[in-house]
C-alpha cells in the first residue's frame, strides 16, 4: 500500500455526496409529513361532516294546535299537567299500552312532554338544514321558511340531546333515540368477549408455549392469520348456518322454556361476533406472549417451576397489558360491524329494549344504516347524531385500552 496515496474522498466529491443525502432525506421527510397532513385533513373532514349534520335549523308545524289541549304555555306544563292531558285525550287502549310499557306516573317530565308532542300535538317537520347552512345562510333560510311554510316555526336544534340517548326507536325522527340500539350493541360485545376471550387466550397460549413447531402447527397458524382477514359477511353466513339454524334450540331459548323466539336472537349475533374477533384475539395474545422476555421462562424453569406454573405465574401476568389492549381493540371492530348482524337477523326497526340473550335486537350501526336510507332529511340528521354516539363509544374503548396498557405495563 502506498503511504503517500490519499484514500479519502476529495472535498468536492464528499460535499456533493453529503448534499445528495440531505436532499434525499428532505424529500422523504416532506412525503411523510404530507401523508400525515392528508390523514389529519381526511379525519377532520369526516368529523366535520358528521357534526355538521347533527346541528342546524329545523322548520316544523303542529298538526293540532296545543291550545286545544291546554291553555298554559308549553314551557310551563308540569308533570301532573301532562299526565292529566294524556289521560284525557289518548284513547284508553293507547294509554293502557303506554302504561304497560312503563308506568305513566314513573315517567319523567321530559318523557311525558315527548309523548304529548308525538301522540297529541303531532309535530310535522317540514325541512332541515345543516349547521354550516344555518350559520352562513340564516337570513335566507328564514325568508324561505316564511314564504313556503307561513305557519311553521324555525329553531336551531341539536339532534344529539340527552333525550336522544334515552329514547327508543320511533317512526318519527323528532322522537327517535338510540337507547335500544346502544343496549343491543352492549349486549353483543359482552357476549362476544365472553365467548372469544377465553377461547382465544387458551388457543394462543397452547400455540405459543406448548405446540411443537411442526408442519401442522404452521398450517394452523397460517389459517388463523387468513381468518383474521376474511370479510365479515362470511362470518355472518357461518353464524346463520350454525347458530341460527343448527343450534336453534339453544340460541332461541326453547331449551330453557322460552317459546316466543327463534334462532335470530342476540345470543346468535353475539356468538357470531365472537367468531369474527376470535382470530384477532388469538393473534394479539400470541404477540403479547412473544413480547415476554425468554429469560423469565428460563429463570422459572431453573427454580423448578413446571411449564404450567411458568405460564400462569410469569408469562400471562407480563403479557396482560398486550392481551387487554388487543382484546379491547378487537371489540372496537365488533362494535362497528353491520353485515354479519343483518344476515343473522338483526331488526332494522324495534322499540323494545333487549332484556336477555334470547331477545330480538338491533345495533347502533344498523340503526345508522336504517336512518341514512330514509328519504326524509330529519332522519339523516339523527343518523349524524347516532354516528357521534358510536364514535364516542369507540373512542371510549380505545382510551380504555391505552389506560389499561399503561396501568399494567411492566418495563424490563
What residues fall within each predicted segment?
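Glycine-rich helix-loop "coupling/hinge" segments at transmembrane-helix boundaries
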Residues: 334-377
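Membrane-interfacial helix termini and adjacent extracytoplasmic/periplasmic loops
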Residues: 157-176, 211, 235-275, 345-346, ...
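Membrane-topology segments of multi-pass transport proteins
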Residues: 1-31, 37, 45-175
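Transmembrane alpha-helices
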Residues: 284, 293, 307-345
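Transmembrane-helix boundary motif in ABC transporter permease subunits
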Residues: 192-224, 237, 402-407
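Transmembrane alpha-helix signature in integral membrane proteins
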Residues: 38, 176-205, 327
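C-terminal transmembrane helix and the adjacent membrane-cytosol boundary/short C-terminal tail
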Residues: 286-294, 301, 328, 369-412
